[in-house]
Regions:
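Catalytic-core regions of core metabolic enzymes
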Residues: 1-252
Length: 252
């Protein structure tokens, strides 16, 4: 790759070119990961074994091959279900946008953690790998145009990669959720509103079924607070969950 690189690993072909030792028990999967920080790569690969990779690379200073080159290659692999990128900068914007377009065409999610969003961190990136970071708002606008996903922490990146690696298309209806707390119900309504995620309008039939399993004082609004007194909670939650799941207006 180049200086500041921790190497390249193709788990499908069992090819590992690296001066560092990575875990030997990694399981092959559909996550392609392109990281401009060796330590971040180490943190992700040494952490959650539910993250299963077909390929990962620490691209370092990118003297020859850059992150956009790796992105295009990863998107052309049949096994790639999601791409994760940790970026200080984009050295080839035209090629990067070509990759974003291809990902959108192939319906392959891209999860991007972009650092260097502030003046102070931009200077650190320049001293680290010689990367000129550029304007974050411009970068963000490009990402949003092509439906890639910006995250803001390594934890959020790991969680997003895990979710998208099991990605299935769901119908555009609405979600339903069930809780043991009125406060939790209020919290999820706020979060869903922030993300523009709609709640399903439960059918009359579902509401009648819920009325028959919930305690008399409980309402049947979605999201559902099903706790009541907590009596026979396991059975109550199971039945309420199944009724929500069977509603024709609920997609998730």
């Amino acid at each position: 790759c180049s200086p500041n690189s921790m190497g390249i690993h193709n788990l499908e072909k069992n090819i590992r070119i690296s001066p560092f030792v990575f875990p030997s028990d990694l399981i092959t999967g559909g996550i392609a990961m392109i990281i401009q920080s060796g330590s971040v790569l180490g943190a992700l690969t040494n952490n959650d074994r539910r993250l299963r990779y077909n390929f990962f690379v620490s691209s370092g200073s990118e003297n020859v091959t850059n992150a956009s080159d790796y992105l295009l290659w990863a998107l052309k692999q049949p096994s790639t279900s999601v791409v994760g990128m940790f970026l200080e900068s984009v050295r080839d914007p035209v090629l990067f946008i070509e990759g974003l377009k291809l990902a959108k065409e192939k319906d392959i999610p891209i999860v991007i953690l972009k650092v260097g969003r502030t003046e102070a961190s931009s200077k650190l990136a320049l001293s680290h790998t010689g990367a000129l970071v550029g304007d974050f708002e411009v970068f963000k606008a490009v990402i949003e145009k092509y439906n890639a996903h910006l995250v803001y922490s390594i934890d959020e990146m790991a969680a997003s990669l895990q979710v998208f690696s099991h990605y299935q298309t769901i119908e555009r209806k609405g979600i339903a959720s069930i809780h043991d707390s009125g406060g939790e119900r209020e919290l999820i309504v706020d979060i869903a509103d922030d993300l523009s995620v709609p709640f399903a309008r439960l059918s009359k039939e579902t509401r009648e079924k819920l009325t028959n399993v919930l305690e008399p004082t409980m309402d049947t609004n979605n999201p559902l607070d099903a706790w009541g007194s907590g009596h026979d909670a396991d059975k109550l939650f199971k039945n309420a969950f199944l009724h929500l799941l069977s509603d024709k207006n609920v997609s998730l």
